[in-house]
Structures are given as C-alpha cells and as structure tokens.
Swiss-Prot record:
Reported function: Plays a role in virus cell tropism, and may be required for efficient virus replication in macrophages.
Glycosylation sites: N69, N70, N105
Organism: African swine fever virus (isolate Tick/Malawi/Lil 20-1/1983)
Regions annotated as coiled coil: none
Protein name (record): Protein MGF 110-7L
Alphabetical keyword list: Glycoprotein, Signal
InterPro entries: ASFV_fam_110
Family: Belongs to the asfivirus MGF 110 family.
Pfam entry (one): v110
Leader sequence segment: 1-20
Amino acid sequence: MLVIILGVIGLLASSNLVSSSTSTRVGGHLPLTFDPPENELGYWYTYVESCRFCWDCEDGVCTSRVWGNNSTSIVENDYVKYCEVSRWGDQCRYDVEEHIYYTMNCSDPKPWNPYKIAKEGVEKG
C-alpha cells in the first residue's frame, strides 16, 4: 500500500515538473504579457520585431535584445510599440498596441502588422 501511495506521489510530482518546464517554451501556457520570457524573444521578434520587449532603449537609441550589440541600432520612434503576447497550447496570440489581437498556430506562425496593412490599403485606394 505504501509503495502505491509513493508511486502516485511520484507521478504527481513529475507531471507538475513537466508542466512547469513546458510553460517557458513555445507550445506551453503563457498568460497575456508585455514581457515574454527571455528564451522566447527570438520567436516573438521574428513575427513582431517592432515590439518594445525586443529592444533595449537608452537615450533614444535602441538595440535589439535578440541580436545584442551585433545588430544595427535604431533611433527610438513610433516603430517601437508596446505589444502583448500570449500562448495557450499551440495557439499564439499577439497585439501591436491596438487591442486587435492576431491569433496563429505557434508551429506555423505568420507575421502580421496592422500598420503595414493599413498603409497598403491607403496606397491602393
């Protein structure tokens, strides 16, 4: 009986460890945040590179947190936006400052920029 109880406790403990370790990888759970985990910055940067969490800005000059000092610096401007990102299972969601959320499959992500779409629409009209 004691062996069974210890076995159940072991299973519960290992499942808890697995779920906590997957929460920091793409595919696990990430509550809505302006500041995703450091190890996911490269993922989010690929699809919404204008997000403020991708940039270290000091005195109006911003350097990529993903590429570090090896990257080209930019002057802080309207391009650098506050973004929210979240993930539940394989559904990733992001918003570029407008509360118009874009949801995508985390394993098949697509870039989306509402500002670029609006600009293209104006040019065509």
